[in-house]
Amino acid sequence: MSNPFLKQVFNKDKTFRPKRKFEPGTQRFELHKKAQASLNAGLDLRLAVQLPPGEDLNDWVAVHVVDFFNRVNLIYGTISDGCTEQSCPVMSGGPKYEYRWQDEHKFRKPTALSAPRYMDLLMDWIEAQINNEDLFPTNVGTPFPKNFLQTVRKILSRLFRVFVHVYIHHFDRIAQMGSEAHVNTCYKHFYYFVKEFGLIDTKELEPLKEMTARMCH
């Protein structure tokens, strides 16, 4: 029997919200195809994330950030009906970790929010970042801003929190769908990438430390 979750995550026919695409013919589109080809060929994920010889680091990172955003979006989208104000009144990763939302607009101070509200603000915020031409230029030859990697670190740290919440609070739903292997593959790909380029502080990775040690040994 076909797995609907697998179809959603890997064929990406359905999205939680509009996803950013790469324009055919651009350098970044070619990098995206190269990255996908490595995954489809079954290449070791540790090797698949490495910067190809002669390629620009910022371009490689940009391609992966957009891809991870799309994939994490879909993972959360598949369990979002079970992540409600009632079931998850606080955005957390178990009893030891609570994530508060802060931005430059409405929430200038770290604010406790329900998980679905936090997720909605998070996805809106990331979407705004990756659609900002000043941060993620799409024209070949347009330089990335000096704060690009700093912004990427913030994006990836916040995306990691989605994995934390899903694994700790909604893994039963993932298992019920028979989709743990697919979510685990997405997580390993994400983890190896951020470790390869030092894009998330070790402290931020603590909530899933034991699971990661077993899964990504």
Curated annotation (Swiss-Prot):
SMART domains: Mob1_phocein
GO molecular function: metal ion binding; protein kinase activator activity
UniProt keyword Transferase present: no
Residues bound to Zn(2+): C83, C88, H165, H170
Keyword Metal-binding in annotation: yes
Function noted in UniProt: May regulate the activity of kinases.
The name this protein goes by in its record: MOB kinase activator 3A
Species of origin: Homo sapiens (Human)
Gene label: MOB3A
